């Protein structure tokens, strides 16, 4: 990142640009700033200031240490909202999350999933809607699974049922 970018880029820009964070979508500033979406999150006023202000020194990374967790938990909420589902739908359709390694699934696009909604329990996995299995992603990511949660694929496909594979339909 050049110094001119540092002065115009927020912590969110810096964080999303880190290799391995490509599963995340950008949570809009208005969503992040909405106090309803911050309910239950600790230190929100201090962390909000950090993640929305321009990054002075990208090498400083996490100033308090909780920014990644805080953004991840806001992200988990956002991807369940309409705008977040639309953003994740675009990424899903492009195949940004990878494809199922199971040969019988014929390179089915996958979705990110967390095995727990609790921070620090596991890293993100990919979920195949065809075989209903979870796998380690091929991409080099160490994102916490709580950034997506265990129910995200179920919510995604229940709200976008036309994306489920015909093989999932018991009538076929």
Curated annotation (Swiss-Prot):
Interacts in vitro with the casein kinase 2 alpha subunit (CkII-alpha). The relevance of such interaction is however unclear in vivo. GO terms for cellular component: cytoplasm; nucleus; protein kinase CK2 complex. Induction: In wild-type flies, it is strongly down-regulated by double-stranded RNA (dsRNA) interference mediated by Su(Ste) transcripts. In males lacking the Y chromosome, the absence of Su(Ste) locus, relieves such down-regulation, explaining why it is strongly expressed. There are multiple copies of the stellate gene in fruit fly, encoding proteins that are extremely similar, which makes their individual characterization difficult. Thus, most experiments probably do not discriminate between the different members. Belongs to the casein kinase 2 subunit beta family. This is Stellate protein CG33247. PANTHER family: CASEIN KINASE II SUBUNIT BETA.
């Amino acid at each position: 990142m050049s110094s001119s970018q540092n002065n115009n880029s927020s912590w969110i820009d810096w964080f999303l640009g880190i290799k391995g964070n490509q599963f995340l979508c950008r949570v809009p500033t208005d969503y992040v700033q909405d106090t309803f979406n911050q309910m239950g999150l600790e230190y929100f006023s201090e962390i909000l200031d950090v993640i929305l202000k321009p990054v002075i020194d990208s090498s400083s990374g996490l100033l308090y240490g909780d920014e990644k967790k805080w953004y991840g938990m806001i992200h988990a909420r956002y991807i369940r909202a309409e705008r977040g589902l639309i953003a994740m739908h675009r990424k899903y359709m492009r195949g940004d999350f990878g494809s199922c390694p199971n040969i019988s699934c014929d390179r089915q696009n996958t979705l990110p999933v967390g095995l727990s909604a609790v921070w620090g329990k596991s890293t993100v996995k990919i979920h195949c809607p065809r075989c209903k299995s979870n796998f380690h992603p091929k991409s080099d990511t160490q994102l916490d699974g709580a950034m997506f949660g265990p129910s995200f694929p179920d919510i995604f496909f229940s709200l976008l049922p036309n994306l489920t594979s015909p093989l999932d339909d018991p009538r076929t």
